[in-house]
């Protein structure tokens, strides 16, 4: 019986997945029982829900059933507090005081974070009971760096849980000394100057208030090699170094999330947190939290804006504060011609991913590929690029000065080399859910066909579908006049981008022209030497009116709506505007004037232009350690720098290695639980240092596998795990034979950028209709039987569409697994795959690097895009959104057979990115809550567009919208999710970002600035300055500092912080090598100075570069004086 509400179809789907999981689990268990592996059973426990995950990751045993009861009764956060209370009361076994407190905090935090992220394990180092100076006892929580993975809210709630545990243990409050209070302020300043910045920059008084009032001590381990200089050697602070985890919990937890903590405190009636209200009020007064406060947006006119009024919204410049070399700026903040805000969701957008017209992806020189991350101005901090061809395309000016709307990919490819200027970048499609998630005020909607259609529907005005999507110029004008409705959006120009005086000038200039019957276009004489012609031609470009320039004449094809918009009755050859100068004078603004002139209502085309710059390029690549290795079998320095075990054997080399081992009764050293030479079960102990019998193990493994010449096999130098237990060498050999690589935990992974998709076409995923029917896809979104590969199907929530390169890699991995089953475990092959299509239907694990829980998925197909397509629920189950991050896929049977906790590094964060537990069935209620805000409608109502003009908060109009949250707990939570905008192909557009294909940094920056030069919404000089200031200068200074502080290394692998007195390696006597070279220090110097001169950056930046150049020269140039004779001065 499933624990989730689902239709009969979805229930069968989940049962199929469970059956496959259990089958693979059985196969792996049978293999593990043979005793060849580190542990004799599969080490990944299966979890059906959050409660199972919590018990599997942090415990205590038998807590899962109680968690289910409490969550059902109280809700997640109250349940977390109650379970913490019951743990310290001894309901789940007797613990010591400190042990019980630590278990309570970890378990409660695991409940809050859905049992997915690694923070409860790795983010809390330990919990101690310490003493105040008055002798009373208090609770101290030691946070570590991985607490970041929990997110700010969970970090704050961890502190709240600590306080709740403290009260139930009858402990006193933490009473800090003045020095301890000031220590936090010093650390926070030092962290931001030496390590990285926080999302929120607190005032010193806020820090003092928080530290003095929080009832538990927020402390932690040293995370960075930076020491405080003022408040050192404090009795209750064990380190003088920065405690990064503690600072994160304090700043990005308690201080940043104060409003959320208050809601929980009030709801749960927890005492001692009223001081947060005063803190919250102060923050609101100074508008610190730009994300949550509506006051950040200033309006020029009255608040209740109409669609005709000007709307001045404060630009957000944070996204452009740092510009990376080689990654273009596509639009400066709110700059005219930037991305036009369009509301809606396509089948491949939502959950922080926005849609862009595929044409613009080509026009910006392929810097926007499918999956490329953009840092955006609003509503969130970042997004992922995906194509949506049903939104407004870019408008460009060609080298011959013609202006053209590039509405197809074919046109974009044809004209891309002829583009002189990109006048308008086109739409950015953002769904309502992203505004709701970011608590960003709704911004006025652009005038679009879906809004226009709603007006016609509400007024019962008949129309055709063809008219809505593609009206002729005459149809649009006549329809507007006869029905007294606004002009169709297709012919509504950007009149607001020029002044009313410009409109007056443009009108007079256009009416000097005449109709050319031969070309069926409006013709205007154009003299390149005439300033009036030049300025009015520019006005024509700025309103987005397409035209051709041929032999000194301008030809306008869409003249009909243009003339009527300007008040000229073309049919009667009559200028209907009287007292033109008076109208211009009396008009409040440009939109007022154009409506006074026209024969119909003209809506404002665009209110908001959104700025954006490139973030990370898309990614689809196999996961490899550095350097890449085939197995977790250590050989020390025997394999030299290339770490090839076969070369070590050929050269007769070995090395001393610290490793678990035992002397078997057969007289051989066994590194495994079962002696590979006699087959006897043994118990390795250690770790101890031994001379590794590499040759014996190599030939034994080859004989066992019946392989003669496996080729090169790369191994590790040593294990970083606690017990130094190793993986069988046979696995490394088989991986090498099949050209696959291993990760730290024994699995073989493929990383790719997360992109959402809720619906797909069979032709997009390279799978036949018949195969899809076998996988349970029987009907399309309209209820019709699946017959052809162009029908749109709704993606099942645990199905994934992987990159083609991932399928190629997994094909190799499947062959490795089959070889492993057959040649090592002596079992039947499982996959038997000969091509990519054979892997469709097989199970994988999806996992994010900041988590410790995997999610079962099923391969349903593959695309050419270098991204991992999956349902938004699937990404949310990994605690991810889709703003450009990357996660991993790996075959489920590979994980069951090869994963072991014994391989994980014995260091802080070592258990992150490891499948310590596996969720088998996706429950939408237990995934990251951000996806609950995603809208699931097939269309937005008219009231939505009208309310957007009032700039209401998203919550004020939530009753108008349907989101995923409204479906939770019902059968509809899995099926019937809608989208508003169609797209032809989800992978249409460039597949590889230019950033990845360009070679040198000079090439990258040249291409970056070439893009900036041709975009109207971008200032190339400002881009050049920002690249130098935010990227090159810090790198140059940092590299100079690194050179002066560097250590040295030897080819044998030895490293020294300082050069030994002998001047050579103490281990082998070889010459020592610098770890930072001269080239690394000055690599950006020439490109920086070239850019500075070419783009005439400020004198300040030029002088900074000169000073850095001087520093580099003084470091590397020999200034030693030469002895000269006096006669040398007279030559």
UniProtKB/Swiss-Prot annotation:
User: What's a Pfam family in this record?
Assistant: PolC_DP2_cat
Write out the entry's keywords from A to Z: DNA replication, DNA-binding, DNA-directed DNA polymerase, Exonuclease, Hydrolase, Multifunctional enzyme, Nuclease, Nucleotidyltransferase, Transferase
Asked whether the UniProt record includes Membrane among its keywords, one would answer no
Record's keyword annotation contains Acetylation: no
Q: List, in alphabetical order, the Gene Ontology terms for molecular function in this entry.
A: DNA binding; DNA-directed DNA polymerase activity; single-stranded DNA 3'-5' DNA exonuclease activity
Gene Ontology biological-process entries: DNA catabolic process; DNA-templated DNA replication
Q: Which reaction does it catalyse?
A: DNA(n) + a 2'-deoxyribonucleoside 5'-triphosphate = DNA(n+1) + diphosphate; Exonucleolytic cleavage in the 3'- to 5'-direction to yield nucleoside 5'-phosphates
Q: What is its EC number?
A: 2.7.7.7, 3.1.11.1
**Domain of life the protein comes from:** Archaea
Q: Which family does it belong to?
A: Belongs to the archaeal DNA polymerase II family.
Kindly give the PANTHER family that the UniProt entry links to this protein: DNA POLYMERASE II LARGE SUBUNIT
Q: How does it assemble?
A: Heterodimer of a large subunit and a small subunit.
Cited function: Possesses two activities: a DNA synthesis (polymerase) and an exonucleolytic activity that degrades single-stranded DNA in the 3'- to 5'-direction. Has a template-primer preference which is characteristic of a replicative DNA polymerase.
Q: Fetch the HAMAP family from UniProt.
A: DNApol_II_L_arch (MF_00324)
Q: What is this protein called?
A: DNA polymerase II large subunit
Look up and give the organism this protein is from. Methanococcus vannielii (strain ATCC 35089 / DSM 1224 / JCM 13029 / OCM 148 / SB)
Upper classification of the source organism reads: Archaea, Methanobacteriati, Methanobacteriota, Methanomada group, Methanococci
What gene name is given for the protein in this entry? polC
């Amino acid at each position: 019986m499933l624990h989730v509400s689902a239709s009969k179809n979805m229930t069968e789907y989940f049962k199929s997945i469970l059956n496959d999981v259990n089958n693979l689990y059985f196969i792996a268990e049978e293999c593990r029982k043979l005793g060849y592996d580190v542990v004799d059973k599969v080490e990944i426990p299966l979890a059906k829900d959050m409660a199972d995950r919590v018990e599997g990751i942090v415990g205590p045993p038998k807590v899962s059933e109680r968690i289910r009861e409490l969550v059902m009764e109280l809700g997640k956060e109250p349940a977390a507090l109650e379970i913490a209370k019951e743990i310290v009361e001894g309901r789940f076994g007797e613990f010591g005081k400190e042990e019980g407190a630590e278990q309570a905090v970890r378990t409660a935090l695991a409940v809050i974070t859905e049992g997915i992220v690694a923070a409860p394990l790795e983010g809390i180092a330990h919990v101690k009971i310490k003493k105040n100076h008055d002798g009373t006892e208090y609770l101290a929580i030691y946070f570590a760096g991985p607490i970041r993975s929990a997110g700010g809210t969970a970090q704050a709630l961890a502190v709240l849980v600590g306080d709740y545990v403290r009260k139930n243990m009858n402990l006193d409050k933490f009473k800090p000394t003045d020095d301890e209070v000031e220590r936090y302020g010093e650390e926070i300043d030092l962290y931001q100057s030496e390590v990285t910045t926080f999302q929120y920059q607190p005032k010193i008084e806020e820090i003092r208030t928080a530290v003095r009032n929080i009832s538990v001590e927020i402390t932690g381990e040293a995370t960075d090699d930076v020491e405080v200089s003022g408040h050192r050697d404090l009795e209750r602070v064990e380190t003088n170094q920065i405690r990064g985890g503690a600072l994160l919990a304090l700043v990005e937890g308690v201080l940043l999330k104060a409003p959320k903590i208050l809601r929980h405190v009030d709801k749960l009636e927890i005492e001692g947190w009223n001081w947060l209200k005063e803190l919250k009020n102060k923050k609101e007064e100074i508008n610190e939290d730009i994300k949550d406060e509506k006051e950040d947006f200033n309006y020029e006119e009255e608040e209740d804006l109409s669609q005709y009024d000007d709307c001045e919204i404060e630009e957000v410049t944070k996204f452009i504060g740092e510009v990376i070399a080689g990654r273009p700026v596509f639009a400066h903040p709110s700059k005219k011609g930037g991305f036009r805000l369009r509301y809606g969701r396509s089948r491949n957008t939502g959950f922080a991913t926005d849609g862009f017209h595929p044409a613009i992806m080509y026009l910006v020189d392929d810097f926007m590929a499918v999956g490329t991350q953009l840092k955006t101005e609003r509503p969130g901090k970042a997004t992922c690029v995906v194509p949506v061809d049903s939104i407004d395309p870019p408008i460009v000016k060609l080298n011959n000065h013609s202006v053209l709307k590039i509405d197809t990919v074919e046109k974009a490819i044809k004209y891309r080399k002829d583009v002189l200027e990109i006048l308008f970048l086109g739409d950015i499609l953002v769904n309502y859910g992203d505004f709701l998630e970011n608590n960003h005020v709704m911004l006025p909607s652009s005038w679009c066909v879906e809004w226009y259609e709603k007006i016609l529907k509400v007024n019962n005005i008949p129309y055709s579908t063809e008219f809505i999507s593609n009206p002729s110029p005459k149809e649009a004008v006549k329809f507007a006049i006869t029905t007294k409705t606004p002009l169709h959006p297709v012919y509504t120009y950007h009149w607001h981008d020029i002044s009313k005086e410009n409109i007056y000038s443009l009108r007079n200039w256009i009416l000097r022209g005449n109709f050319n019957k031969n070309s069926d276009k409006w013709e205007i004489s154009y003299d390149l030497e005439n300033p009036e012609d030049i300025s009015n031609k520019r006005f024509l470009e700025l309103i987005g009116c397409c035209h051709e320039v041929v032999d000194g004449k301008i030809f306008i094809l869409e003249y009909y709506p243009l003339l009527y918009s300007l008040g000229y009755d073309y049919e009667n050859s009559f200028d209907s505007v009287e007292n033109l100068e008076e109208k211009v004078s009396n008009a409040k603004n440009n939109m007022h004037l154009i409506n006074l002139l026209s024969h119909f209502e003209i809506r404002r085309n665009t209110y908001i232009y959104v700025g954006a710059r490139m973030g990370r390029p898309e990614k689809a690549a196999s996961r490899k350690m550095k350097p890449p290795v085939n197995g977790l079998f250590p050989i020390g320095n025997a394999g030299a720098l290339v770490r090839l075990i076969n070369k070590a054997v050929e050269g007769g080399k070995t090395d001393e290695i610290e490793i678990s081992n035992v002397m078997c009764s057969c007289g051989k050293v066994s590194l495994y639980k079962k002696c590979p030479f006699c087959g006897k079960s043994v118990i390795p102990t250690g770790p101890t240092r031994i001379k590794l019998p590499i040759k014996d193990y190599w030939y034994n493994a080859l004989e066992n596998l019946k392989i003669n010449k496996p080729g090169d096999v790369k191994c590790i130098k040593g294990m970083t795990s606690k017990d130094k237990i190793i993986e069988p060498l046979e696995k490394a050999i088989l991986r090498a034979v099949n050209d696959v690589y291993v990760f730290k935990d024994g699995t073989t992974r493929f990383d790719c950028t997360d992109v959402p998709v809720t619906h797909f076409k069979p032709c997009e995923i390279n799978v036949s209709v018949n195969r899809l029917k076998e996988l349970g896809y029987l009907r399309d979104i309209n209820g019709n039987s699946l017959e052809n590969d162009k029908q749109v199907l709704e993606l099942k929530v645990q199905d994934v569409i992987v990159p083609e390169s991932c399928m190629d890699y997994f094909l190799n991995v499947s062959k490795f697994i089959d070889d492993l089953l057959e040649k090592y475990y002596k079992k039947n092959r499982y996959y038997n795959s000969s091509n990519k299509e054979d892997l469709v239907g097989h199970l994988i694990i999806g996992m994010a690097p900041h988590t410790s829980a995997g999610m079962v998925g099923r391969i349903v197909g593959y695309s050419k895009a270098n991204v991992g397509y999956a349902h938004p629920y699937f990404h949310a189950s990994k605690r991810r959104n889709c703003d450009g991050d990357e996660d991993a896929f790996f075959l489920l049977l590979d994980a069951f057979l090869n994963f072991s906790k014994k391989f994980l590094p014995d260091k802080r964060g070592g258990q992150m990115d490891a499948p310590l537990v596996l969720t088998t069935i996706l429950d939408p209620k237990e995934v990251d809550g951000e996806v609950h805000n995603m809208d699931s409608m097939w269309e937005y109502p008219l009231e939505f567009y009208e309310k957007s003009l009032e700039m209401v908060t998203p919550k004020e109009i939530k009753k108008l919208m349907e989101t995923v949250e409204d479906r939770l707990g019902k059968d509809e939570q899995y099926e019937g999710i809608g989208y508003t905008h169609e797209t032809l192909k989800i992978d249409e557009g460039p597949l590889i970002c230019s950033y990845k294909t360009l070679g040198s940094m000079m090439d990258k920056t040249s291409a970056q600035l070439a893009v900036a030069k041709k975009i109207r919404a971008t200032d190339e000089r400002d881009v050049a300055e920002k690249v130098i200031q935010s990227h090159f200068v810090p790198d140059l200074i940092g590299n100079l500092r690194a050179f002066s502080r560097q250590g040295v290394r030897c080819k044998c692998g030895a490293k020294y912080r300082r050069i030994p007195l002998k001047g050579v390696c103490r281990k082998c006597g070889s010459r020592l090598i610098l770890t930072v070279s001269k080239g690394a220090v000055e690599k950006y110097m020439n490109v920086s100075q070239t850019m500075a001169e070419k783009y005439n950056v400020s004198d300040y930046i030029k002088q900074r570069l000169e000073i850095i150049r001087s520093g580099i020269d003084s470091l590397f140039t020999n200034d030693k004086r030469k002895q000269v004779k006096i006669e040398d001065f007279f030559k």
